[in-house]
């Protein structure tokens, strides 16, 4: 299960011995788990949605999936409140949890583990930058198409089953605006709308 980690067998064996494998079902809010604040959490399998909380809303930032093993809880620092960033499981997920003190001790001994930590932080940072640029420069239709393409890639299917309300909440647009945007994409032959799903044509 840990073989995809970009780490040597020695380091992986240490993480196995001292870490804990945790399983979460779809819909679980990771901030509700004390281990999320007390240890470093590495995504092993599944899909997690990262959102930012603003005015009682949760706006989608980006997704994490197991194609790239990564530290999830980059907000696990004294200066960053977990109330700001929300991590929601959208496909059953497996996480490796390592106590904070032990992980920091290991990073001082194993450069590869420190590099993995830095790479994870950079990944989160660049995704936030990219999201900011998207919001600033793209039309609603462009945001919608990018969103649908991301879902298609994550679920490995051109047919995506997702409620209109969820799209509305993720992108922070009204359901009416999302519906109009989807209609425009359909008119431009980018998608086909069905009763309970969306089929991506432009992939």
Language-model-detected regions and their locations in the chain:
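Glycine- and acidic-residue-biased ligand/ion/polar-headgroup-sensing regions
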Residues: 38-51, 66-68
């Amino acid at each position: 299960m840990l073989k995809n980690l970009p780490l040597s067998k020695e380091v992986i064996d240490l993480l196995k011995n001292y870490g804990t494998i945790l399983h979460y079902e779809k819909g679980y809010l990771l901030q509700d788990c004390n281990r999320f604040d007390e240890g470093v959490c590495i995504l092993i399998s599944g899909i997690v949605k990262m959102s930012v909380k603003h005015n009682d809303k949760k706006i989608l930032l980006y997704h994490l999936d197991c194609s790239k093993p990564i530290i999830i809880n980059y907000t696990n620092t004294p200066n960053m409140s977990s109330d700001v960033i929300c991590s929601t499981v959208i496909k059953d997920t497996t996480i490796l949890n390592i106590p904070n003190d032990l992980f920091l001790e290991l990073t001082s001994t194993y450069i590869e583990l420190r590099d993995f930590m830095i790479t994870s932080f950079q990944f989160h940072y660049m995704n936030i930058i990219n999201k900011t640029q998207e919001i600033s420069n793209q039309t609603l239709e462009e945001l919608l198409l990018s969103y649908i393409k991301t879902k298609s890639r994550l679920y490995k299917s051109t047919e995506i089953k997702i409620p209109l309300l969820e799209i509305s909440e993720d992108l922070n647009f009204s359901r009416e605006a999302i519906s109009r945007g989807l209609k425009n994409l359909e008119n431009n032959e980018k998608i086909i709308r069905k009763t309970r799903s969306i089929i991506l044509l432009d992939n």
